[in-house]
């Protein structure tokens, strides 16, 4: 067995579910799990400073390989001393492989055994990304946790296509492992794919587990499938993954999905959802979603969430934040973004306490009722 730079320590398993309380040890510090990771696409979490992220309890953030490769370039970031120094963040960083962005943003994709040729979304230039190149970029970035290059097939793709895709993704994972230049200080995760097909998810997981990655990601979810379909995939995928390694569900940030994935044994999550909806004035609160731009809040001098102790809620009113957003003032977006990130990071803190107290199912029921999920199952 390899001595990996990323280690998982299980502290407690909840009595009634598969939920795990633990911590992940990285070269840039240790963070508790389950954990929600804010997304810093362009080496910044939109409108937030590193100090604010630490203040809210983010022990790790995510950055995007594809975007940083295109701009400003991974070699420039390496010259700066790596991503941590470049963005002045001294805690853990996870980078994705660039695969999802190639499939979702780029034009004219052509997938072969070698990799993917595509036109980049900034200037239309033809580019090529292979498993080896994705690893090389991430080695230059110097993230603590890296992702294997994978194909992310759509959830409802035909079985035969998905089968070929996961087999290629497994071969790509092995190529990425062989290309990894910094296994002593960067942990590379394998990504389980397989759309909604149980046998293909199991095959993908078996292939990757045999390669002894320091952690495993579950990809290809939160791409249009229903909440129940996501839970079903987790039900048959998570048990295939080792108990002594971290489990990361990619691209998931809706509160109900976070809680239900924790119940099934997932440790890490990321999503642009909290900052994206914040820019439109949509706020997550303990009583459900609140669209602070709405006219009814024009003279509402209460906090976004009376039960929240974040900087935004302790200092500013709905009326003021609404005014800022209506006037296109950046400070308004800073305040709503901070609040939403704080909400999800601290939801995970509350979930960790519920695991410690062995009452996660009761916590889930109470949260769902207060948040309004009975009326609308995808009420972000």
From Swiss-Prot:
Pathway: tRNA modification; tRNA-queuosine biosynthesis. Transmembrane segments: none annotated. Binds 1 zinc ion per subunit. GO terms for biological process: queuosine biosynthetic process; tRNA wobble guanine modification; tRNA-guanine transglycosylation. GO terms for cellular component: cytosol. Its EC number is 2.4.2.29. Substrate binds at residues 96-100, 150, 193, 220. SUPFAM superfamilies: tRNA-guanine transglycosylase. Residues 251-257, 275-279 are annotated as: RNA binding. One of its GO terms (molecular function) is tRNA-guanosine(34) queuine transglycosylase activity. Pfam families: TGT (PF01702). Keywords: Glycosyltransferase, Metal-binding, Queuosine biosynthesis, Transferase, tRNA processing, Zinc. It catalyses: 7-aminomethyl-7-carbaguanine + guanosine(34) in tRNA = 7-aminomethyl-7-carbaguanosine(34) in tRNA + guanine. HAMAP family: Q_tRNA_Tgt (MF_00168). Catalyzes the base-exchange of a guanine (G) residue with the queuine precursor 7-aminomethyl-7-deazaguanine (PreQ1) at position 34 (anticodon wobble position) in tRNAs with GU(N) anticodons (tRNA-Asp, -Asn, -His and -Tyr). Catalysis occurs through a double-displacement mechanism. The nucleophile active site attacks the C1' of nucleotide 34 to detach the guanine base from the RNA, forming a covalent enzyme-RNA intermediate. The proton acceptor active site deprotonates the incoming PreQ1, allowing a nucleophilic attack on the C1' of the ribose to form the product. NCBIfam families: Q_tRNA_tgt, tgt_general. Homodimer. Within each dimer, one monomer is responsible for RNA recognition and catalysis, while the other monomer binds to the replacement base PreQ1. This is Queuine tRNA-ribosyltransferase.
